[in-house]
Amino acid sequence: MEPVTLTTDRLVLRAVGPQDTEAVYAACQDADIRRWTTIPSPYLPEHARGFTEQMVPDGWANDSMFTFGLFLPAGDLVGMLGVTMISLGVGEIGFWGAKEHRGRGHVTEAAVAVARWAFTDRAVDRLEWRAEVGNTASRAVAQRAGFTMEGTLRSGINNQGTRRDCWIGSLLPSDLSLPSTSPYLPAQT
């Protein structure tokens, strides 16, 4: 599909392209982004070029990964957010916030907007969030966006060649008062 642009009260969410390579490269020099995400480390200019010129457009073109740069109206990059399709109707959300823009709710705002879009326009019925145990900032964003924490997966992610435990949470359309595309029958306890 062709990339879409979403707007919130404070942000413009759009696919990044070659014009954003330098901003992506600069943001990814932050030690916290390198520590808690699976980007290459060290993060080189060619990694940013590959991301903005190949990975992002290819993900949109083959409907496998929908990546949004989070921008202020003036054009400043405040973060990145993507939804990777992992099975029919199920996507996994991932995000990071640029160091100088953290703590202002931008990533949470974007996560809710992209979740609404995924549920209504992409027929997603479940969004999963995962983060390495200890990444309390990512967990706080997910919780503020409405994700339900479901537990800890042992050896649930691979970061820089090392298996690590991760937290997992989910967001369903009903959590945002939206209909699902498929019936959902919760377990009876």
Predicted regions, residues:
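Juxtamembrane helix-loop transition sites at the ends of transmembrane segments
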Residues: 47, 53-56, 167, 172
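Hydrophobic residues in alpha-helical segments
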Residues: 28, 37, 59-61
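Conserved GNAT-fold acetyl-CoA-binding loop/helix
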Residues: 32-54
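A short helix-loop-beta-strand connector motif used in the catalytic cores of GNAT acetyltransferases and
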Residues: 55-69
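Acyl-donor (CoA/ACP) binding surface of acyl/acetyltransferases
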Residues: 1-32, 67-189
